[in-house]
């Protein structure tokens, strides 16, 4: 999308009614709009739009990972300008997105997150969730799919992967399920500058405080358990050059301080997770 300048919007949404994302984020509601075949989301806690676009651009360098592509966008609504992101609707006609929380409640009448929380051991929790979802949907290989999600979330520090943010797609006309592409990475890369990770806070403190979901508060504990069960199924083929290109494209509406923080996080994660880097990290 062609950008029109720092103080101008790419799209005006005055004639469209916003929806909120209640229940789909652990940090409050985020305005979003559906316009024709695209979704638009405004930044709510900080730089979620930047996080969404950076993560999706870098996932283009990962083999075997289906993902939703986001792009940065500046929106005008009722005279105010908002940063955010836009994505194409990934559901086909007569398809619906079903969260694993909703699916589990539908079959058992119980809360999946509560049942998982009763289980001792991260590996056991992962096995329980993947087993129940395979049983309820008929999908095979949900554990490998889940490992990919946990790997991407660990690498990009996604703190919002609760059971209402894990989903499958139901095909109404075929009465069967399919895997959903990876989506919703807005609360990644320490994007919550409003409450938990203000830009003036030392990065080391932020990294020590950020917490994972849904099996453990520790990203590495989740990832290690999933890799022991299903192996490492994500390999990134990007290096610093690709990161710089992505930041130049996606960071156009954000401060230099914000972009520099994201750069520092990414370089640190590339060093930390060398086993996920295919020779360039």
What feature does the model see in each segment?
Residues 1-112:
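Conserved ATP-binding subdomain of kinase catalytic cores across diverse folds
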Residues 43-44, 172-281:
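C-terminal catalytic region of ATP-dependent kinase domains
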Residues 64-66, 160, 276:
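Short helix-capping/linker segments at secondary-structure and domain boundaries
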Residues 68-78, 162-172, 279-281:
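Short alpha-helical "patches" and their helix-cap loops
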Residues 90-150, 249, 253-261, 265, ...:
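ATP-dependent phospho-/nucleotidyl transfer catalytic cores
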Residues 125-191:
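Conserved kinase catalytic-core segment
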């Amino acid at each position: 999308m062609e950008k029109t300048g720092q103080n101008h919007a790419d799209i005006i949404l005055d004639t469209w009614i916003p929806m909120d994302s209640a229940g789909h984020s652990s940090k409050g509601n985020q305005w979003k709009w559906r316009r024709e075949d695209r979704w638009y989301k405004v930044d709510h806690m900080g730089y979620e739009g930047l996080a969404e676009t950076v993560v999706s651009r870098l996932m283009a360098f990962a083999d075997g990972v289906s993902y939703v592509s986001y792009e940065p966008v500046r929106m005008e609504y009722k005279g105010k300008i908002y940063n955010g992101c836009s994505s194409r609707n990934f559901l086909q006609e007569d398809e619906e997105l079903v969260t694993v929380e909703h699916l589990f409640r539908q079959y058992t009448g119980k809360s999946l997150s509560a049942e998982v929380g009763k289980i001792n051991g991260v590996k056991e929790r992962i096995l329980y969730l993947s087993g129940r979802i395979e049983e309820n949907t008929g999908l095979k290989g949900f554990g490998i799919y889940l490992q990919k999600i946990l790997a991407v979330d660990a690498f990009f520090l996604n703190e919002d992967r609760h059971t209402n943010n894990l989903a499958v797609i139901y095909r109404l006309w075929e009465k069967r399920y399919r895997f959903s592409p990876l989506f919703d990475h807005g609360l990644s890369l320490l994007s919550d500058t409003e409450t938990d990770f203000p830009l003036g806070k030392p990065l080391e403190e932020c990294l020590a405080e950020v917490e994972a979901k849904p099996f453990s508060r520790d990203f590495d504990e989740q990832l290690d358990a999933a890799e022991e069960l299903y192996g490492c199924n994500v390999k990134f083929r990007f290096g610093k050059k690709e990161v710089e290109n992505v930041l130049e494209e996606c960071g156009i509406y954000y401060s230099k301080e914000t972009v520099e923080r994201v750069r520092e996080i990414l370089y640190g994660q590339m060093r930390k997770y060398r086993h996920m880097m295919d020779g360039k990290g």
